[in-house]
């Protein structure tokens, strides 16, 4: 068992009428299993990305830099926005290139996520770590715990499969092609066998 990892929180930097975020897609290494190092992908870190915090009716501007050495993208899953800012398979970011989307947040308060959506390799890149959570706040947000990482806990559940050397195995069996990829190890925020000790009586998991 090990302490639950909590992704860092990025609420952006407000200037020139928008809330600005700087996101770097990068390669890294992460220790999932004792004594083993695993090659991963991450956003502003080795594995997964920071939790982005948006506000409803606020304009956000994002600088997405692709430093992983292959084409990628970032898609804002569940958001209502123009197709030019969507980050879908039609908006590939070439290696060593930068994409600068911006949009008005029209979503109500909720929990969303962002992830690679590049053609042909989205599954593999997300499997290796190119994904993160988005929290949207609005003026009608109910009075529930909202102290991030203290009584408001992000829970990113993933199933993964590892080789004996700690490497991530993706679609490496025939049945994966037929029935879909299913790992044999559960992760929570990239942590195997996580433990959390609540410091409050009321705890929010999202």
Which residues make up each language-model segment?
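Histidine-centered copper-binding motifs that mark active-site loops
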Residues: 1-206
């Amino acid at each position: 068992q090990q302490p639950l990892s909590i992704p860092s929180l990025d609420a952006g930097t407000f200037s020139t009428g928008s809330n600005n975020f700087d996101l770097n897609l990068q390669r890294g290494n992460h220790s999932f299993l004792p004594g083993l190092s695993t090659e991963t992908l991450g956003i502003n870190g080795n594995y997964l990305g920071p939790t982005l915090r948006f506000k409803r009716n606020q304009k956000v501007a994002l600088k997405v830099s692709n430093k992983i050495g292959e084409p990628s993208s970032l898609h804002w899953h569940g958001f209502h926005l123009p197709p030019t800012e969507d980050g879908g398979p039609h908006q590939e970011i070439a290696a060593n290139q930068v994409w600068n989307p911006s949009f008005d947040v029209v979503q109500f308060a909720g929990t969303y996520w962002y992830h690679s959506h590049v053609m042909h390799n989205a599954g593999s890149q997300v499997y290796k770590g190119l994904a993160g959570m988005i929290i949207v706040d609005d003026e009608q947000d109910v009075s529930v715990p909202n102290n991030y990482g203290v009584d408001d806990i992000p829970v990113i559940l993933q199933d993964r499969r590892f080789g004996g050397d700690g490497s991530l195995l993706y679609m490496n069996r025939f049945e994966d092609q037929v029935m879909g990829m299913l790992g044999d190890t559960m992760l929570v925020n990239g942590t195997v066998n996580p433990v959390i000790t609540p410091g409050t009586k009321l705890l929010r998991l999202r």
